[in-house]
């Protein structure tokens, strides 16, 4: 176990320990760049003290590479990663959305991701990427079910 200062934000602790996907943005809990999972729920690591996370499960994008890999390609395909600075927060929140609601509609996606700020792409690329990913995922799952039923 590591000694930490009582006022150290989780964001700073994670970055000091090599979790560089967690970005520093506004430091006021408004931009979503510092999103991590705390006990499987998305939280803003700039607004939580590292000491409060002691004993909890903390997951950063580094721990979700496999789950994020396919999805990120759809974001990139839509040109939604111009500078890429906001991507880790978007990806973390999109994964949380997919886990919570595997079939969100466009309004649910917009609402869920409303806490993520992007300086350069206007969100439309991210939205198109998410919708295309969900369509691809549903088609893939449907094909998998059809193949499984044909094998019986």
Please provide the spans of the model-predicted regions:
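Signature of N-terminal electron-transfer/Fe-S-associated modules in redox systems
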Residues: 1-152
């Amino acid at each position: 176990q590591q000694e930490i200062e009582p006022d150290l934000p989780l964001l700073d602790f994670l970055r000091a320990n090599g979790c560089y996907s967690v970005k520093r943005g506004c430091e006021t809990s408004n931009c979503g760049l510092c999103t991590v999972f705390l006990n499987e729920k998305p939280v803003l690591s700039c607004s939580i003290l590292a000491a409060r996370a002691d004993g909890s499960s903390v997951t950063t994008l580094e721990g979700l590479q496999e789950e994020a890999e396919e999805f990120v390609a759809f974001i990139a395909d839509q040109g939604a990663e111009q500078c890429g600075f906001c991507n880790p927060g978007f990806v973390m929140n999109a994964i949380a959305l997919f886990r919570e609601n595997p079939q969100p509609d466009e309004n649910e996606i917009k609402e869920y991701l409303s806490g993520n700020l992007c300086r350069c792409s206007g969100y439309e690329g991210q939205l198109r990427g998410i919708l295309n990913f969900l369509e691809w995922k549903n088609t893939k799952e449907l094909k998998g079910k059809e193949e499984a039923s044909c094998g019986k």
